[in-house]
């Protein structure tokens, strides 16, 4: 849940969503251009972290890098 909270804290306050996590419109309306991160439908694929720009008009690459670093650190702590 820490990762979800991080996404929520980074999200743009000017955007309204139905949940604490940035939601994306996949119908092509580009409503959430400033959204932080766009996962696949229902968070089905955690391996697809690179597909954040499918429903958002870009601009979230920095947050993607931060997530990757955070996940990497957690894995190292578990291994050692």
UniProtKB/Swiss-Prot annotation:
<protein>
    <recommendedName>
        <fullName>UPF0512 protein Q</fullName>
    </recommendedName>
</protein>
<comment type="similarity">
    <text>Belongs to the UPF0512 family.</text>
</comment>
